[in-house]
């Protein structure tokens, strides 16, 4: 097994499978978590896991970096889009993927959805979907 595969397994184990207060901590106060719909599905997690090995590792590494730097993370890794919605930006060769997120109280970062970028601009439908998920999250968590 190559070094790259070992790193992929490490990221998968530590970021995807281990969620909760027992997760390893960085010297930051930020913690990324996946938005869950009413039926328990997690669109951003499902998107990341559906990617090929290299893109999956890149996206999981970016989630790690996002937890370390939080709202200080800038381009080329993160970009603000609209009304408090941000995108994590991953590129490998000509393949470009994005994961949408927003900041919540007490350093929580909520990853909402992801997509493969095909056009120059981020599709408005993806931003609208992230806003819809944020609205649902806030309603169910009593902060709207």
Model-predicted regions and their roles:
Residues 112:
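Conserved catalytic cores of phosphodiester-cleaving nucleases, focusing on short active-site segments
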């Amino acid at each position: 097994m190559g070094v790259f595969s070992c790193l992929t397994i490490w990221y998968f184990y530590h970021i995807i499978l281990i969620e909760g207060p027992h997760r390893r901590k960085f010297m930051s106060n930020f913690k990324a978590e996946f938005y869950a719909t009413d039926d328990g599905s997690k669109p951003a997690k499902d998107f990341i896991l559906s990617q090929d090995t290299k893109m999956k590792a890149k996206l999981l590494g970016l989630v790690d970096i996002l937890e370390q730097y939080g709202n200080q993370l800038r381009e080329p890794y993160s970009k603000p889009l609209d009304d408090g919605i941000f995108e994590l930006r991953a590129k490998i060769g000509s393949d470009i993927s994005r994961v949408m997120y927003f900041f919540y109280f007490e350093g929580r970062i909520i990853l909402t959805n992801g997509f493969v970028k095909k056009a120059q601009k981020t599709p408005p439908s993806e931003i609208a979907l992230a806003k819809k998920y944020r609205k649902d999250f806030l309603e169910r968590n009593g902060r709207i």
